[in-house]
Amino acid sequence: MTVTQQPKIRIKLKAYNSSLLNTSCKKIVDTAERTNAIAVGPIPLPTKRRIYCVLRSPHVDKDSREHFEIRSHRRIIDIHQPSSQTIDALMKLNLPSGVDIEVKL
């Protein structure tokens, strides 16, 4: 038994700003649906928190520390049954520079 797989595009988005990420996801889903492809998502992935601990004083006072954190938000969008028009429209899409995009076919 051989199962034929439908063509699928998986888009992984990553950004530090969640509002920028959400607007980018909306643009991608709208573009995919405009070209009659089936868009599944955006599926939120767990947010990664990086916490950095820094000494406030340059010399003494080891007890005085300051914490900084940076959060990276991630989303996945799957596009099923993409056509060549869908791929062309996604390539021409203008997204903000603060969003990291990874595309797999």
Curated annotation (Swiss-Prot):
Keywords: Chloroplast, Plastid, Ribonucleoprotein, Ribosomal protein. GO terms for cellular component: chloroplast; ribonucleoprotein complex; ribosome. GO terms for biological process: translation. GO terms for molecular function: structural constituent of ribosome; tRNA binding. Pfam families: Ribosomal_S10. Part of the 30S ribosomal subunit. Involved in the binding of tRNA to the ribosomes. PANTHER family: 30S RIBOSOMAL PROTEIN S10 FAMILY MEMBER. This is Small ribosomal subunit protein uS10c. It comes from Porphyra purpurea (Red seaweed). The lineage of its organism: Eukaryota, Rhodophyta, Bangiophyceae, Bangiales, Bangiaceae. The gene is rps10.
